[in-house]
Amino acid sequence: MSAIIDVYAREVLDSRGNPTVEVEVYTEEGGFGRALVPSGASTGEYEAVELRDGDKNRYLGKGVLKAVENVNEVIAPEIIGLEVTDQVAIDRALIELDGTENKGKLGANAILGVSLAVARAAADELGLPLYQYLGGFNAKTLPVPMMNILNGGAHADNNVDIQEFMIMPVGAESFREALRMGAEIFHSLKAVLKAKGYNTAVGDEGGFAPNLKSNEEALQTIIEAIEKAGYKPGEQVMLAMDVASSELYNKEDGKYHLEGEGVVKTSEEMVAWYEELVSKYPIISIEDGLDENDWEGHKLLTERLGHKVQLVGDDLFVTNTKKLAEGIEKGVGNSILIKVNQIGTLTETFDAIEMAKRAGYTAVVSHRSGETEDSTIADIAVATNAGQIKTGAPSRTDRVAKYNQLLRIEDELGHTAIYQGIRSFYNLKK
């Protein structure tokens, strides 16, 4: 094997026109890896810290020159000479070099860029696809896509409180078929919205963001779109929601303010509302149904719905093994959302997925609202046999890049490729 001989970072743009970090790693045997770092809109307070310059005269304060400098001047000298395939040692060196709990010194965006680029360089040098390098010969499960086709909340300027309404083509026989179903429903939804006189512009993640009258109208409209596309809701296609409740939670009164609905709810009332929605619609997954610090509320939600609905912790667990271990111990949730930039290194990401699986929790590999053409998360989903991926609508190249990579992987795996469909929800007791 060979050592790293050069590490170089630059400032580039993400899908929202904001700066982000791109890192390149070169090895002495000619291996090359490049990685771009994503960025979130609704972020959990326990996430690893993204370093931004704060200079209002450049990119409205969102520049990342400091993070780039940290890669080029602080990190590079430390990892040049290290064995490129020793991912765990390199990630440990990055964590120790930063020395903070939340990677706030060097920036999670600097650290993650290096961590991912190192893995790509190692795979390139070995002549292996990234998913195979990371997951070995047993990496063969294609994920069920969780496709965000209708947006509200922080991802849209409308009066829908729930941040994301998603479809999951669980009845497909292959990933290719699942993607086709999702794309057909997406186009069907556009036609349904147009016929109702709604705007069909798309939001950050490629989903539509019409000014619907209520959260339930969003669910009803998606059901109509699924049926008009020729599919059966509740059989071939299930619904999923990301409520992003921390955005609705008011710390002063400890209640949830659903401004679009014009109502204020307690934790108990939120749980009762979800129970009502689940009884009326084929909802199989709810993400961040309560505030990230409302552990009592999450426990109640898990007790009431955890046996039949996937309850995903995003802001709740922030891809962090300490937070996840606490959730497992308290019996909170039954699934974790995996975002590489919430924790900042590939090793820690894999640790979180492993911990989730051992506890019978599912792991949903996820994009961020500020994305790039980098498709690493597609490879991570297959490498870990996660079984689910959340990477937006089949619209906008930053989202489609991940889907296209999964199509390539499925082709490459041939007859050994597995698409689990509904069996991906091994956390449910149905």
Curated annotation (Swiss-Prot):
EC number: 4.2.1.11
Localization in the cell: Cytoplasm; Secreted; Cell surface
UniProt enzyme class: lyase
Active-site positions on this chain: E205, K339
Catalytic activities: (2R)-2-phosphoglycerate = phosphoenolpyruvate + H2O
Cystine connections: none
UniProt key word Transport: no
Cofactor: Mg(2+)
Primary site of residence: cytoplasm
Origin superkingdom: Bacteria
GO biological process: glycolytic process
Protein name in the entry: Enolase
One Gene Ontology term, aspect cellular component: cell surface
InterPro entries: Enolase, Enolase-like_C_sf, Enolase-like_N, Enolase_C, Enolase_CS, Enolase_N
Alphabetically ordered keywords of this record: Cytoplasm, Glycolysis, Lyase, Magnesium, Metal-binding, Secreted
Binding site for (2R)-2-phosphoglycerate: Q163, K339, R368, S369, K390
Membership in a protein family: Belongs to the enolase family.
Biological role: Catalyzes the reversible conversion of 2-phosphoglycerate (2-PG) into phosphoenolpyruvate (PEP). It is essential for the degradation of carbohydrates via glycolysis.
Matches recorded under Pfam families: Enolase_C (PF00113), Enolase_N (PF03952)
Organism annotation: Geobacillus thermodenitrificans (strain NG80-2)
Cofactor note (record): Binds a second Mg(2+) ion via substrate during catalysis.
Binding site for Mg(2+): D242, E287, D314
Pathway terms, separated by semicolons: Carbohydrate degradation; glycolysis; pyruvate from D-glyceraldehyde 3-phosphate: step 4/5
SUPFAM superfamilies documented for this protein: Enolase C-terminal domain-like, Enolase N-terminal domain-like
Gene3D superfamilies assigned: Enolase-like C-terminal domain, Enolase-like, N-terminal domain
